[in-house]
């Protein structure tokens, strides 16, 4: 179905566009928009595919900026026909979850809202709080994002006190469990003192709490407690009693007065300006507010109803059927209320209603959710204004032609030349963009233990960063997403001069804005200036540069520590070809130390399982060079 990839978009090739649009039938289904690299830009669904896809290419200037940008990148269109619109919605949700197209990511990656992660992909899953969803492992489950991080931490702390769960990312000891096992906080997963099946049964109970099913869990535990008492297993009954008592305290101060406490319901509302929509979703179970989720969405993606529709599709599309509420209260009518309700009802296998309440208690609940969304929007606007002020001040301070969109900062870390590394951190629009961070190992042979050279190290790293533009002069520079509007060097005049000399050799220095920030007096140096820039250390632009430098310093130190630890853990046996980790363990088990291995003869070495005559001779020759 897909033509050969062309560098010309469909939009510019009108004949090809018309031919492709005629191939699309007026039936329900899902459509894919691909760019010139064959990457999926967007996945959508429609009751009539042809009409929906055609609408993107009519009066493009009237589309929101995000959609207009996407349309200009479309090089091909594919489609899948379905029998019904509901099937198209279900297929769209699965495909978006699988491919994560750039223009489908309506929800912004906002780090202030944390998730709870359960790593079902592991034999003994962990449960922990994180601010980043990792999409690599489909089995792992995320709950959230939660607005009240303090309440989330309190709940998780209570859960870990009531249920024995894996506490550590890595075992503390190789041959015995740690103190958490002794005090009953962990079932000894590091030593496999509990089977994976039994451990997962415990974790399934814990997950019910974060699915809003605490009442159901309490009922289950109560039945188990009664059965344990009947079996005269009083210790188990007492443990279950304590768990029930602890769980009954969850949410007691968050009672929401609604007419039917038995119905599970969610209430969702938003507040928006011309850029951002702050969405709040309250989860109410048995009349209690058990979860408060927050989302940041692109306000230019459509009407308020359309934004709510997309948020609900994204949120419920990744939820388990058991987590879906029976009633969803919305702030405003959705464009496709019946379709979404039908889709959720099919997944839940029970009727799910979506209503926009106008009177009485439910309307008051929506007003409360909307009020919370307005508070979140005000906080977001304040933070955004503070960042914008810092960028404006920095542009004025450095006489930049426009506000710096992408700022890069570089730092070096080592101990007297050993394990020398460098960091590159990136701020986009004044905020950390960790997906663009980079680490470098210093390759300069003159930089080694006992001999450091920060000037040469920085020159090397900046040369490696920008040499691709020297090798490919036709490659676009300024105005592209990968080209920095400002480069910051951690250091003084000497470091700046070394970097400028290196970049001059590869003919990129003329297109870069470069400064350095000296540590001691927080002085800013510019190319060609012998004296530092006169600044006030408290002005917003300077504080932004200092935050950037501190982040580069932190990132460099963390990488240096990692490399140093790897070197310290490295065994001399690692240098022997053919001697892998398993064989090293066999040798150390037989001889107890490297000193004894060094003293062993080839005959003694080959007596160890998995060590043949040739490898035994290699090991002997390594320790006894001619």
Swiss-Prot record:
Classification via Gene3D superfamilies: 5' to 3' exonuclease, C-terminal subdomain, GIY-YIG endonuclease, UVR domain, UvrC, RNAse H endonuclease domain
SMART domains associated with the record: GIYc (SM00465), HhH1 (SM00278)
Every GIY-YIG domain range: 26-105
Keywords carried by this UniProt record: Cytoplasm, DNA damage, DNA excision, DNA repair, Excision nuclease, SOS response
Cell membrane recorded as keyword: no
Domain of life: Bacteria
Annotated Gene Ontology cellular component terms: cytoplasm; excinuclease repair complex
Annotated ranges, domain UVR: 215-250
SUPFAM superfamilies the UniProt entry points to: C-terminal UvrC-binding domain of UvrB, GIY-YIG endonuclease, RuvA domain 2-like
Cell compartments where the protein resides: Cytoplasm
Broad class of the protein's primary localization: cytoplasm
UniProt cross-references to Pfam families, sorted A to Z: GIY-YIG, HHH_2, UVR, UvrC_RNaseH, UvrC_RNaseH_dom
GO biological process: nucleotide-excision repair; SOS response
UniProt-listed InterPro entries: DisA/LigA_HHH, GIY-YIG_endonuc, GIY-YIG_endonuc_sf, GIY-YIG_UvrC_Cho, Hlx-hairpin-Hlx_DNA-bd_motif, RuvA_2-like, UVR_dom, UVR_dom_sf
Molecular function GO terms recorded: DNA binding; excinuclease ABC activity
Family assignment from sequence similarity: Belongs to the UvrC family.
Subunit structure comment from the entry: Interacts with UvrB in an incision complex.
Function: The UvrABC repair system catalyzes the recognition and processing of DNA lesions. UvrC both incises the 5' and 3' sides of the lesion. The N-terminal half is responsible for the 3' incision and the C-terminal half is responsible for the 5' incision.
Protein name: UvrABC system protein C
Organism of provenance: Acaryochloris marina (strain MBIC 11017)
Native organism taxonomy: Bacteria, Bacillati, Cyanobacteriota, Cyanophyceae, Acaryochloridales
